[in-house]
Design a protein with these regions (language model features):
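Conserved activation segment of eukaryotic-like protein kinases, specifically the C-terminal portion
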Residues: 91-109
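Catalytic-loop of the protein kinase fold
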Residues: 52-68
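Conserved catalytic-loop aspartate of Hanks-type protein kinases
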Residues: 126
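Activation segment of protein kinase catalytic domains, centered on the conserved DFG
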Residues: 27-42
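Short beta-strand micro-motifs within the conserved protein kinase catalytic domain, predominantly
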Residues: 1-9
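Structural motif in protein kinase domains
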Residues: 16-26
Length: 146
């Protein structure tokens, strides 16, 4: 290989024909039956349960990080995901979309011995996000939208 030539890399990703959950609900909510909504909710819970079985916390679940392909849920954006031991040994910061974030993450406790004790995102944080997503799937509305 010549010194001036550059290697090129390609990233191949699976295609999601219906885009994000947010887009899918905006476009198809009125035609979804309750069985469809329940199916999406079960798929979402199953996908996150699979992660948790391997002690992985997603940490950034929201309607923009859930993709839909042929009416099947695909979790995306694992950039903030952590193994449980990594999450519990590091300080967690809030990166995700606020309405989907575990409210405990905003409760900073100040004590004399520990000036700032940050809440560590965990499996329960993902479960909270799933609850918000399930509400969005069932209602068709953005969370906490006025």
């Amino acid at each position: 290989m010549a010194a001036d030539s550059k290697e090129q890399y390609s990233l191949v990703l699976e295609y999601a024909d219906s885009n994000t959950l947010k887009d899918y609900l905006n476009q198809h909510f009125k035609e979804l039956q309750w069985n469809d909504k329940i199916g999406l909710a079960l798929q979402l819970a199953s996908a996150v349960s699979f992660l948790h079985e391997f002690d992985i916390v997603h940490c950034d679940l929201h309607a923009g990080n859930v993709l839909i392909h042929q009416k099947k849920i695909k979790l995306a954006d694992f950039g903030l995901s952590k193994k449980i031991d990594e999450v519990s040994s590091s300080t967690s910061r809030i990166f995700g979309v606020i309405p989907y974030t575990d409210p405990k993450a905003f409760n900073h406790q100040h004590t004399i011995n520990n000036p700032r004790k940050n809440y560590k995102l965990n499996k329960k944080s993902d479960v909270y996000s799933i609850g918000v997503l399930m509400w969005q799937i069932s209602s068709g509305c953005q969370p906490f939208d006025s």
